[in-house]
Curated annotation (Swiss-Prot):
Binds 1 zinc ion per subunit. The keyword Zinc applies. Monomer. This is Cysteine--tRNA ligase. PANTHER family: CYSTEINE--TRNA LIGASE, CYSTEINYL-TRNA SYNTHETASE. Pfam families: CysS_C, DALR_2, tRNA-synt_1e. NCBIfam families: cysS (TIGR00435). The gene is cysS. It is found in: Cytoplasm. GO terms for cellular component: cytosol. ATP binds at K266. A motif ('KMSKS' region) lies at residues 263-267. It is an enzyme of class 6 (ligase).
Length: 469
């Protein structure tokens, strides 16, 4: 089955066919860096990380552009409140975003443009819109004339006549629906020279200029959170196509993260930061959790569901540990190219069906259960095969345990040392002929998942099948 993705514009699944295979061009709206990342940002970053990885498995050469919005009304408000330069706010929070993405195992973008580094390209695009009759200067600002573009609203499915006015600060607008491409300078705010006087770019025009600068006038995929669909992506699409660009061929949007059914927002005081989440689980377990729901669905966060996901991931780790104990080192991390032929067909079918990660994870756990059954039979050949499949699936989704074998070796040594302490105490009890204590210690180990075998050369232990139904 070919790869199919849900295209927001067509409101249905479409077979993915890049314009210039094997090259795939993809733009994802990155962070507006006025604050540290929260769980919603992290989910969006991980959704498109899985897509980048899966496209690579299909043999595509992905050019992935993710922007940084480093000048914005919100950034300026934070800077004013803290009494520091706007760029200091932007850079401080960018570093937190970058650290979070790296900690969660995201593939770095091919290019990561910053808005303020592309003022000439933004000005050039605004000039094209004015020349085409789709934008107009007014009072030092420049606005996009929404009603000059009849297709406006097509991406998000909105009727312009039913829309409310957008930006309230545009006193020079000809129409309440028009939005700013360029904002005239205000006292105390940063500004750049332009044909319309000093000022700074509007949010929407930044993304249009940066995406087409690096990916061309028409590119394959535009992604972002569902909260960006309107007005941001609608405005991007309208101004870009009004300027004569084909712009994005496929639009993908990930669902939001809620808390007890309520959208997370700073104003409600219910956002969850990276630091808060990492007090509960490890980064790899957080990654497993955030990609575990289908990307287009709403993810309603709870500590219980996070803990369940972490436990599910630890079951996979338990299999890896026991399999490594039997057959040796884990297989080396597999390069993405050519990997598709070594994955279970059901796993491939799941990800080809609009990145159905929940189904793909179900396949992985099924293989883990088969692997645990093979371990119980000490079938090295079968264990090695299942181990290869599981590690290949983990590699595809960026879920291989950190530090690979070295981490498992360290964990194995810790468990071995603890088991030996108890076994030494058990042996001392047996020497004293205190068999009740010896049996109780063995039972304690069994309850902890450690099976003890008494052999002529002394007691040996192995981990019981820790996979839960």
């Amino acid at each position: 089955m070919p790869l199919r993705l849900h295209d927001t514009r067509s409101r249905g699944l479409r077979e993915f066919q890049p314009a210039d295979p094997p090259r795939v061009t993809m733009y994802v709206c990155g962070a507006t860096v006025q604050a540290p990342p929260h769980i919603g940002h992290l989910r969006s970053g991980l959704v498109f990380d899985v897509l980048v990885r899966w496209l690579a498995v299909h043999g595509y050469d992905v050019v992935f552009c993710r922007n940084v919005t480093d000048i914005d009304d919100k950034i300026l408000r934070v800077a004013a409140a803290e009494g520091i330069p706007w760029w200091q706010v932007a850079y401080r929070n960018y570093r937190l975003f970058d650290s979070a993405y790296r900690l969660l195992g995201c593939v770095p973008p091919t290019v990561e443009p910053w808005a303020t580094g592309h003022i000439p390209q933004i000005i050039a695009l605004i000039r094209r819109l004015i020349d085409a009759g789709h934008a107009y200067p007014a009072g030092g600002d420049v606005y996009f004339a929404v009603r000059s573009f009849p297709a406006y609203g097509g991406l998000s499915g909105r009727d312009p006549d039913a829309l409310q006015a957008g930006e309230s600060d545009g006193v020079h607008k000809r129409d309440p629906l028009d939005f700013a491409l360029w904002k005239g300078a205000k006292p105390g705010e940063p500004s750049w020279e332009s044909p319309w006087g000093p000022g700074r770019p509007g949010w929407h025009i930044e993304c249009s200029a940066m995406s087409t600068t690096y990916l061309g006038s028409t590119f394959d995929i535009h992604g972002g959170g569902l909260d960006l669909l309107f007005p941001h992506h609608e405005n991007e699409c309208a101004q870009s196509q009004a300027a004569g660009d084909g712009f994005a061929r496929y639009w993908l949007h990930n669902g939001l993260v809620t808390l007890r059914g309520e959208k997370m927002s700073k104003s409600l005081g219910n956002v969850l930061s990276m630091d808060q989440l990492l007090e509960l689980v490890r980064p790899i377990e957080l990654r497993y959790y955030l990609i575990g729901a289908h990307y287009r669905s709403t993810l309603d966060f709870s500590e219980e569901s996070l803990e369940e996901a972490a436990a599910a991931y630890r079951r996979i780790e338990g299999f890896l540990l026991r399999a490594q104990e039997l057959v040796g080192e884990l297989p080396a991390a597999d390069p993405q190219t050519g990997l598709i032929d070594r994955l279970p067909p059901e796993f491939v079918a799941a990800l080809d069906d609009d990145l159905a990660v929940p189904r793909a994870l179900a396949v992985m756990h099924s293989v883990v259960r088969q692997g645990n059954a093979a371990l119980a039979e000490t079938d090295k050949t079968a264990v090695r095969r299942f181990l290869g499949e599981v590690t290949a699936m983990l590699d595809v989704m960026g879920l291989r345990p950190p530090d690979d074998g070295s981490r498992l070796d360290a964990l194995r040594r810790v468990v071995d040392n603890l088991a030996r302490l108890v076994l030494d105490e058990r042996e001392a009890a047996r020497q004293r002929r205190d068999f009740a204590t010896a049996d109780a210690l063995r039972a304690r180990l069994t309850d902890a998942g450690i099976v003890v075998e008494d052999t002529p050369s002394g007691p040996r232990w192995h981990l019981r099948d820790l996979d839960l139904p």
